Amino acid sequence: MAQLAKFDVPEELTNKALEALELARDTGKIKKGTNEATKAIERGNAKLVLIAEDIEPAEIIAHIAPLSEEKKAPYIFIKNQKELGAASGLGVSCATVAIVDAGKAGEMVQDIAQKLEALK
């Protein structure tokens, strides 16, 4: 498996990001899937991008982190694609999700973004 993550994220922060995703899914707006997330990042709409680490082949998501860096969108790596799919409300695994409107998770997303910036 290719090593995509440039920084280690504490499990506590990963869990908080998944919790924020679930809240944003219910009260805001999210974009599910690599193509939809890529469009949200390119348009500058992504508030937080969640990327599954266990995607094969890794080339499918290899562009997400550099694009997020370029567009100043905070991103976090999630260990498991099934976990990411479940948190985004899908019955299947998911490679990438972008939170576009955080809804009631707004403060949570801002806090996660600040902590991620400090880790880099």
UniProtKB/Swiss-Prot annotation:
The lineage of its organism: Archaea, Methanobacteriati, Methanobacteriota, Stenosarchaea group, Methanomicrobia. This is Large ribosomal subunit protein eL8. It comes from Methanosarcina barkeri (strain Fusaro / DSM 804). GO terms for cellular component: cytoplasm; ribonucleoprotein complex; ribosome. Belongs to the eukaryotic ribosomal protein eL8 family. Its main location: cytoplasm. Part of the 50S ribosomal subunit. Probably part of the RNase P complex. Multifunctional RNA-binding protein that recognizes the K-turn motif in ribosomal RNA, the RNA component of RNase P, box H/ACA, box C/D and box C'/D' sRNAs. GO terms for biological process: ribosome biogenesis; translation; tRNA 5'-leader removal. GO terms for molecular function: ribonuclease P activity; rRNA binding; structural constituent of ribosome. It is found in: Cytoplasm. Signal peptide: none annotated. Coiled coil: none annotated. Pfam families: Ribosomal_L7Ae. Keywords: Cytoplasm, Ribonucleoprotein, Ribosomal protein, RNA-binding, rRNA-binding, tRNA processing. The keyword Cytoplasm applies. PANTHER family: RIBOSOMAL PROTEIN L7AE FAMILY MEMBER (PTHR23105). The gene is rpl7ae.
